[in-house]
Amino acid sequence: MRGQFPRTAEQLQTLPGIGRSTAAAIASFCFGERVAILDGNVKRVLTRVLAFSADLAQSANERELWSRATDLLPEQNLPETMPRYTQGLMDLGATICTGRQPQCLLCPVQALCRGLATGEPGKYPVKTRKLKRSAQALSLLWAQRPDGSVWLEKRSSPGIWGASIACPSLKVTMN
């Protein structure tokens, strides 16, 4: 970047730890760039307003929501409107259009909200839960010959680290 701070969301994403939504927020607030953000609060607001019922756990559906979020962005006077629009969406999701008990009667966009019109705004966004992972304890055996070679074996295909080469292991019962 030749000593210059990035000025676009695309450039900001090249910095370590800056993802798409954070980069968009910075670009919107600081430079008035017309770019959508999609943090958790904004996802909740947009899926409810649009009655977007596609499962956001599927990347194609998340891409579609990004596209719709972009379509809804202001188009004029961007240096002033983009920071206000972005902050407004974030605040709406954090304070009124909350996850557990949305306060629809206080919402400034209730007349536009298709989720409210369904009578079930709380069912949005749709995101299937990931499977809960169980904890396993393993003891690894380290066996080394005098010449420095180590005993390794190919793990069975199903299961954790399937078909990988590893030290022999034993499952340990957890109490």
Where would I find each of the regions flagged by the language model?
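Catalytic cores of DNA base-excision repair glycosylases
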Residues: 1-105, 109-122
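Intrinsically disordered, low-complexity, charged terminal extensions of DNA damage-control enzymes
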Residues: 91-175
